[in-house]
Amino acid sequence: MMRDRTYLRGAAAIAALLLAGTATGAQAQWSQDSGSGSGSGASDAAPASGAASGESDRKGGKRAEKQKKRRQVDVSPYLEIGQVLTAELKNGGDVLTYTTVAAGVDAVIATRRAEAAATIRYEHRFGESGGLGDADLLSGLARARLELMQGFNIEGGALATRARADGRGADSGLFIGGANNVANLYSIYAGPTLTKRIGNLDFGAGYRFGYTKVDIDTPAVLAPGVPVGDAYDSSTNHVAWASLGQRPGDLPFGWQVSGGYEREDSNQLDQRFEGKYARADVTVPISPSVALLGGVGYEKVQISQRDPLLDTNGVPVRDSNGRFVTDTSQPRQLSFDTDGLIWDAGVMWRPSPRTSLTARVGRRYGDTVYTGSFAYRPDDRTLFQLGVYDGLSSFGRGLTTGLSALPTQFDPTRNPISGDVNACVFGQQSGGCLAPQLANTTTAQFRSSGVQAILSSRYGRWSYGVGAGYDRRKLLVPTGSVLGAINGTVDEAYYLFVSAGRQLDSSSDLSISGYLNYFDNGSPGASDVQSAGISAAYSRRFWRGLTGTAAAGLNAFDQDGFNSQLIGSALVGLRYNF
């Protein structure tokens, strides 16, 4: 009898993880793109939210007390001034200097009903030498969740940063000085989610709106013979989903039915993504720590766009911003079209509250799909996450989905020289990287698959973070289009980001970060791109909120058809935190 109770308690705990927060589980049907690093498994490894198993019910009070003890509201507005020097250490390049004046705010909030983390910064640069002009820059990253009532949350996120405008162009890793191939991008998403226990059923629903905008600051300089491509403009994205499920108990298995709809409209070539699905899933516990998963459903997805307007020579016409002009007189053409049965099967293993593994294989998009996730927390200071994803995505949808996958609690960090937001963020509960999305502002829709790993840890006065991954994109363009030659082009990206920080004493600290990127370019005539960099910063508080910083960095870039670059940079600055 005792063994039966243990078995049922373990089975209920597994099922709670799969069925609790059912809105997230249904939404994950649209979240298997780059950057999430979790695919459909994201909800599987997440703690139960809004509804708990019998075991977690008994522990809920203890968790609530811990949350109250961890109540934190830390909002730090600041003013900053700095002097920057950059020098091209190869090829006899220029030495550039400029002064920065910045205002910003870093915030971490954790209360009973709200969680948020943000770093927002406005900066003006006064160019001084090397022909460098003045510039205004806005950058930031924010994630927040607000519980309006039990089970009903409003979530949102925003990103403002700079990235590579064209994956076939340079990747200096440092968007300062005379760098080319620079795009200013802005992305935001927001929406409500609802999780509710109705009798012995779990109900979930949600909606998300996303918007992404790109301004090309400095166009890419491409290798000889590489044709100039299109440039991303803006897109809007709507996602809605709902689900209803039941955990094992009355039945020897758990079940869930779900459905969703998504649409994205892009300004470029009147591009449109539209998808809908309905499916049923079952969870069959076979031991206190293992459950079998299975699902079957129907899905319809269409991606379409129009051709660019052609001049008398058959060359696409461009507007003043270098973007293709849409030929609205031509009919819409399909880039991708699927309509039919989808299925997947898998297993979930949860031997302890600190370890969980989910793996699935199935059929979607007319192809075999593999997804999964692994999470391991050996202690309260260390977390390792691994995600495998495969799905349809775009630059805009990838950014908003990647933002939604980031934690609401993280340490806001930036490049100490350029002030840009780091591509990877780390927190005590989870982390994430937007490196795949920021590698290339492609205008085409694509099939995205890959793997992402995150490690974050604290030991004594040290804190560490590592983000690494691989992302593969297969471009989807109408075969009958004048741009049809790039249909099926495969781009691959490998990335690594490492950061470490140490509090030296009560008044000073040291931070170090580095990155390594490799972009395997599949575009005709384009060459592969590799870049790497490392930076270090020392900060010391002199008086109350006044802090001085000294930083140095080294960035390297190499691509066939270009001179390799080695850029050294240094900064000295003062910040006053209010």
Model-derived features with residue positions:
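Gram-negative bacterial Sec-dependent N-terminal signal peptides
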Residues: M1-Q27
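Gram-negative and organellar
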Residues: A28-F578
